[in-house]
Amino acid sequence: MRGTSAVCWSLLLLIALLSQNVTAKGGRGGARGGARGASRGASRVRLKTSSRYGSLRVASQAAAAGAAARAAARLSENTWRNNDHSGMDTQFGNSTNEGMYSYRAWTSGTCPLSSHLSFRLIISIGAILTCSSSSIYVSTKINLGK
């Protein structure tokens, strides 16, 4: 359960950080800018340092990427460990201990990881799409209201 939630949160953070909307206009714009700038003797072009590589943003992206990589590594490690069929039981025995004839193979709870993971992924993707569509609406409204 912890691994599933770690995977979902890492993917959610990673997608949210990588799909951040950077096209929205920042600062004061529109009619307020007319009272400043050329009318006061300053140059028209104002240089503003880019906050694209701010330390907090870079650190949070690195943490999200590290968490996603760690969760993916743990998930792949567990699948490799569970799919190891090189033992003597599976080669020469009838494989009834954990194989096809076991109780868990015929119940609906065979793989609880996939059901929880799919449910959380659907919820996460829905939240991301909702947030991204609202940010697109806000940025369009800002750009149209120049």
Curated annotation (Swiss-Prot):
It comes from Xenopus tropicalis. Keywords: Amyloid, Cell membrane, Glycoprotein, GPI-anchor, Lipoprotein, Membrane, Prion, Signal. It is a lipid-anchor; GPI-anchor. It is found in: Cell membrane. Transmembrane segments: none annotated. Belongs to the SPRN family. One of its GO terms (cellular component) is side of membrane. Residues 109-146 form a propeptide. It comes from the Eukaryota. A lipid is attached at S108 (GPI-anchor amidated serine). Residues 1-24 form the signal peptide. Its main location: membrane. This is Shadow of prion protein. Prion-like protein that has PrP(C)-like neuroprotective activity. Glycans are attached at N94. The keyword Metal-binding does not apply. The keyword Glycoprotein applies. It holds the Pfam family Shadoo.
